[in-house]
Design a protein with these regions (language model features):
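N-terminal intrinsically disordered, cationic/polar leader segments
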Residues: 1-140
Length: 140
């Protein structure tokens, strides 16, 4: 039964490699006490890009930048580019949207885990990014 549930993705792409392409974490309040009782504000920007590497192999990159502030002080900034190499089993150009959206859904749990762990290891409450609508992100 599980193989039938995954049939749509199996027809579309094969995961060949997943990796961190670039990462940066700036801990701007590590040695300072946060004196505010205010809830931190988090701004998250997300971008997707894909490039054909060769033949049917494509690299998909999920870019996430998160900036967290308390009042006017920046607590931390994290920038992550997480990528995957996928073999596309389709060649129809209108399927590009489906590839990018499905590929981003594969990459996202890894991105969320990395960001959660880095912010926790940076001395802050873990930043847990809520599920994203990759169809909407692709459209923008």
């Amino acid at each position: 039964m599980a193989s039938n549930m995954n049939k749509k993705n199996d027809d579309l792409l094969i995961i060949k490699k997943l990796y961190i392409k670039d990462i940066s974490f700036e801990n701007l309040l590590s040695s300072k006490k946060i004196s505010s009782n205010s809830e931190p504000a988090v701004d998250i920007n997300v971008k997707l890009s894909s490039v054909n590497i060769e033949n049917n192999d494509h690299e998909l990159i999920l870019y996430i930048k998160a900036e967290t502030r308390v009042e006017k002080q920046i607590m931390f900034i994290i920038e992550l580019q997480y990528a995957g190499i996928f073999e596309l089993k389709i060649s129809d150009e209108k399927k590009n949207r489906e590839f990018v959206v499905e590929g981003a859904k594969i990459l996202f749990p890894y991105v969320r885990t990395i960001i959660t762990n880095i912010t926790k290891d940076g001395g802050f409450n873990p930043l847990i990014i809520q599920p994203l609508d990759f169809n909407k992100i692709y459209s923008n």
